[in-house]
A protein has these predicted regions:
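Alpha-carbonic anhydrase
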Residues: 2-290
Length: 290
């Protein structure tokens, strides 16, 4: 068993400090001068229909230990023991990527068809051959981020309760991690990963490093309004309520945005999946959770 430690992407991008979300117009470096910045508005009209092979995913079904921390910008978690690291390949990716961390944005950073979702989770990965995110960021395509969008459900999602209980505990406790056992990453992924947008962009926090491969899944997972509100009560380093922590939309600037259309549509509040549905999933997107 190993543990993961959820970390805000700004730490990964190079120890940039002193920035806030209300002050986005003054973010320095590539945040102002870059031409391939993230997030962007996504829609069928700006994308090109594409066909990608299925993803191959390893290690996302394990029960793991995590340390959850409020770093003043997001909920963060980082792996403590770098063994049995979750990996992903296929899906049009150029190589094998290993999971570095997860973090959350409320509301969503990306929009789809002009709709902004209540929550977005980023799974930040680095190319395995580089051995770390710091090394991978020096190479275009060295870092791949997978975005999972959450949509509102009338009911709480019980799988999320343990993590949200920890986040509630650290809302006002900055940079002091709490430990949680039995965290399963795949519980935070859509059932069907066959549909997604793919484009080249940047980190969404300073210093906004470019050369990032983005995958934004089109199928969402449910979360209740009450559960989202737990994120919205987190505090910043200045003891200000962090009601929102998303970057404004950036210009596409002629970039090629690809869309693989999912044969199925799983939205928040979806009911049980029958045998025929599962058969179709595995015919179109073979995913291994081990």
């Amino acid at each position: 068993m190993f543990s993961i430690y959820l970390v805000c992407v700004s730490i990964i991008s190079g120890t940039v400090t002193g920035w806030t979300y209300p002050d986005q117009d003054h973010w320095a470096s590539l945040c102002q001068t870059g031409t391939q910045q993230s997030p962007i508005p996504l829609s069928h009209s700006v994308s090109e229909d594409s066909d990608f092979p299925p993803f191959s995913i390893y290690g996302y079904g394990q029960n793991i230990s995590i340390l959850v921390k409020n770093n003043g910008h997001s909920a963060e978690v980082r792996q403590k023991t770098r063994t049995h690291i979750p990996e992903i390949s296929g899906g049009g990716l150029p190589e094998v990527y290993q999971l570095d961390h997860l973090h959350f944005h409320w509301k969503s950073e990306h929009t789809i068809e002009n709709y902004r979702f209540p929550l977005e989770m980023h799974l930040v990965h680095y190319a395995k051959r580089f051995g770390s995110t710091q090394g991978a960021l020096k190479h275009p395509g060295g870092v791949a981020v997978f975005a999972v969008l959450f949509d509102l459900s009338p009911d709480d999602v019980q799988d999320f309760d343990p993590l949200l209980a920890e986040i509630a505990t650290i809302q006002t406790k900055l940079n002091v991690p709490d430990e949680l056992e039995g965290f399963v990453i795949k519980n935070y992924l859509p059932i069907d990963l066959a549909g997604f947008y793919r484009y080249n962009g940047s980190l969404t926090t300073p210093n906004c490093t470019e050369g990032i491969i983005w995958t934004v899944f089109t199928n969402t997972i449910p979360i209740s309004k009450q559960q989202v509100e737990i994120f919205e009560k987190m505090r910043t380093v200045n003891d200000v309520i962090l009601e929102q922590n998303y970057r404004s939309l950036q210009d596409i600037n002629g970039r090629n945005v690809q869309l693989k259309v999912s044969p199925l549509r799983f939205m928040a509040g979806g009911s049980t999946i029958n045998v025929a549905t599962f058969s179709l999933i595995f015919l179109t997107c073979i995913i291994t959770f081990t």
